[in-house]
């Protein structure tokens, strides 16, 4: 059935608007354009049937059309019920690429959309491009008969990578995977600089709140937390960090942030942002101690960090202010403003990361798909990384757009350092 369904989107009439947005984004995504220049003729992904489960945004549309330009067949769903940009989905559908995504899916519709991507006209999927692990998990649990035909998985985000390593340790991962998230040009750019801009965009569009002078609590000080903390401090907030890792906690303290527990911070904060990728970060006892009209949001992948169930069961009243903005009246008389139902605030309430930084991430995705498809012998079942040389190539593809001029090593300097004159310039264990 699924191979006969060309698409399901909110409104195909939005395609012209989506195409204009794609045209602008392409000019901000030099890495993906470089991929097209290098590989459109040779089509290294010819024969690949890629099922993609990743936020259906304008930037993702540029990724999808790059994969198609490189020879792949693609079917797509979003990895979040609120993250689809309907004009982008319409543009992809209009281009003849099967896409099943719209903003505001139910959980049942979300699963249905993923299932529409599993079968192509010439057979089932043979590659996975995932963000968060929902597609990977679905095939391993519900459609294991498809696993033998799948050559590889490329995983976009921290949560999905955790899932892959958990599957590997439990002996249930059956397909080779590349951890795209931990490419330096992904985690140190998308996670940090992307969140530094898109978090504020989401909070401002949702609430119009003045951030200066407020107390902001950021749960987690990984790359995402670092970007969020920088952004909030840049707007004039006093930022408090919560952390479990002593190294990250020390980093936060050395940057001048107060570091304490959520049990303490919940009494002080006006704005709360969870960034951990873990469960049970903000619970009922924290809500009960928050200030009136505290704003609570999440920028981790899943909606498990904030106990939304507690709010729904214990609030006296829930008032929807506008899409993805809800105000809960607690029994103590105070109110809580929850954004995007505890899901990704930057995509639920705004447009996600800017195109330029997503070009870094998605160029890694394209390279990972090419590697897995063309060199399956190099990647046994397990979780792998892209080679350092490719990571550096992703960065170099973006320098011209920023008018960056690289210094070149001389032969003498390269010999002195004991490295190739054209890199790689750092060992794999270097942390940047």
From Swiss-Prot:
The keyword Phosphoprotein applies. The keyword DNA repair does not apply. It is found in: Cytoplasm; Melanosome; Nucleus; Endoplasmic reticulum. Substrate binds at residues 57, 131, 156, 186, 190. Its EC number is 3.13.2.1. The modification N6-(2-hydroxyisobutyryl)lysine is found at residue 186. Pathway: Amino-acid biosynthesis; L-homocysteine biosynthesis; L-homocysteine from S-adenosyl-L-homocysteine: step 1/1. This is Adenosylhomocysteinase.
